[in-house]
């Protein structure tokens, strides 16, 4: 069986990002979101996440790899803030710009998640697919995040077992500062496109969230 988790990063980055992520869950194929806990829109995101009972909600950590001595304290504060906002433990853990992959950061994170039994992106039995992204080499590549681009990824990258595809949908509002901006609205349209949902059905891929991992992995 092929199982697919579709996770939105940057939940809480702005009200427009929050709105797009919730839409991608309610109208599209999104099954999980990763929450930034220290942003102005974090409280709104957490409230929206609590309303979306079928959407797995994890934490999107912001850590300073250049000051590794501070990482344990940053980690503890952000995990505590997540619990405060969501009133539950995270279903999964990842990080802004994948900083958790840095060898100066990773041991601290794995020590906590090992005790808590929470999967870390790229360090669990869930295969991570990061190719649904519309920018590289300083150039925008909308073809990678359009419908045809996503269908190619489904065919080439989703295998037997559990795969996580991360994405960055959202609405870009005035004042939103990010090098990855207009691409987010393209991602949102793609995730909500009926052709994508039908393609997943045709390929016998089952959409799940992180809460479904034990059943999917036969644990």
Can you say where each PLM-predicted feature lies in the sequence?
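Catalytic domains of cell-wall/extracellular-matrix polysaccharide-remodeling enzymes
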Residues: 81-158
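Acidic (Asp/Glu)-rich catalytic clusters
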Residues: 21-27, 42-58, 80-86, 156-159
């Amino acid at each position: 069986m092929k199982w697919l988790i579709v996770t939105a990063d940057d939940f809480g980055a702005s009200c427009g990002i929050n709105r797009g992520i919730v839409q991608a869950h309610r109208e599209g194929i999104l099954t999980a979101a990763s929450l930034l806990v220290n942003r102005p829109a974090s409280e709104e995101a957490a409230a929206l996440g609590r309303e979306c009972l079928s959407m797995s909600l994890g934490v999107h950590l912001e850590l300073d790899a250049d000051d590794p001595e501070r990482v344990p304290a940053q980690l503890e504060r952000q995990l505590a803030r997540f619990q405060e906002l969501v009133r539950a433990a995270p279903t999964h853990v990842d990080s802004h710009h994948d900083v958790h992959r840095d060898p100066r950061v990773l041991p601290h994170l794995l020590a906590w998640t090992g005790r808590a039994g929470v999967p870390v992106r790229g360090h669990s039995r869930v295969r991570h697919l990061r190719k649904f992204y519309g920018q590289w080499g300083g150039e925008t590549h909308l073809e990678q995040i359009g419908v045809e681009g996503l269908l190619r990824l489904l065919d080439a990258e989703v295998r037997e077992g559990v795969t996580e595809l991360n994405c960055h949908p959202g609405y870009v509002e005035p004042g939103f500062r990010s090098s990855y901006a207009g691409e987010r609205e393209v991602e949102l349209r793609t995730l909500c496109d009926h052709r994508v949902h039908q393609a997943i059905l045709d390929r016998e891929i089952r959409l799940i969230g992180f809460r479904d991992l034990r059943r999917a992995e036969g644990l």
